[in-house]
Amino acid sequence: MKKLLTIIVFLSMVLSACGLSPTATTTPTATRTKTPRITETPTLLPTNSPTITPTLSYPPGGYGPSNFPADVDPLTGLQAANPVLLQRRPMLIKVSNMPRNVRPQWGLSLADIVFDYYTEEGSTRFAAIFYGNDVSMVGPIRSGRFIDADLVQGYKAIFAFGSAYVAEMQRFNASDFANRMVVEEPYTPLKRYDPNGFDYLVVNTADLSAYATKRGINGVQNLNAMFFNLPAPAGGQAGTQLYVHYSAATYNRWDYDPVSGKYMRFSDTADVTEVGQSEQYAALTDRLTDQPVGFDNVVVLYVNHELYSPGIYDILLSGSGDAYAFRDGQAYRVQWHRNATDIVSLTMPDGSPFPFKPGTTCFEVIGLKSTVAQTGQSWRFTHQMP
């Protein structure tokens, strides 16, 4: 009876989900070969909700940036509900953000880390990294972009995506992670799901990890770099709200919720095409859990966007640069760092590691000429190239 009720609730949620389509459109993703379709509504796995370590048990010195205990997720600083999951590679899954009718997405709130970055024609896309827990459905899955090469190499991840432009696919195929790419082909775990006439590509992370193990490309990786601690560092400014404006069609807002300690995501619901026109927002939810999408840390990264060809950008996420980190209602001016084979880390102005709040992180990637304006506790970032 309980299982039947869960299925009914989830079906009701899927049937009610819809959105507005923006003026800006994205290039359709080419699919390769017909794959099996999901014929039953997926049920939530018990591991969909990561276990958070009680505050009193967190070490005063924090965890990281190296020598993480075997049961602590180095991407969240939290004890894993199932430490066995940490003996594998992370999974980087491309998740669509536009057009608006793909929202709400499945599984986005359950990722350890999410990167939100500009693609083309005013749109953004998510690179969601799953590691410390498994999620029964993630999607809709879309195509890869140049920046994904840096992310897959840094996080040593299994790379699940829909397709890519020719030049991007050539770079992926020539990389050292070419054997870790998983696309829509027969016998891969990427499946088609078709609610309300939409033909979505989705994946179960447990199936994706098992597929990597079967192919002999899974196993524990060195993911050192991030530092976590519960107390917020000194030197911050009030930062209970931030806006990230990518284009007239794609923009978002984060509101700090002192009860959960998370920044809750609000997404655009209409294009802003006229001077003086107000932005319009709605809370982003997770279609898998029907819960609001929120992250413990939100970090805005200033990164060079190099024009590769008309409409295609190569986002160069290596080296170091300026950044703003938001946690616990506070904003911090920091520096981001990433060597060619490492994950993203942050430092304070004095060079000491910036302490991420234990939990999940969303990185907003914007151009080097992007502007920032502060009004009281609210911060507004406007994306500008390069």
What are these regions (language model features)?
Residues M1-K2, T31, P36, K191, ...:
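Short, intrinsically disordered low-complexity segments
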Residues M1-S16:
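Sec-dependent bacterial lipoprotein signal peptides
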Residues M13, C18-D73, P83:
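Ser/Thr-rich, Proline-interspersed low-complexity disordered segments
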Residues P54-A111, E120-P386:
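A surface/extracellular/periplasmic glyco- and lipid-processing/surface-interacting theme
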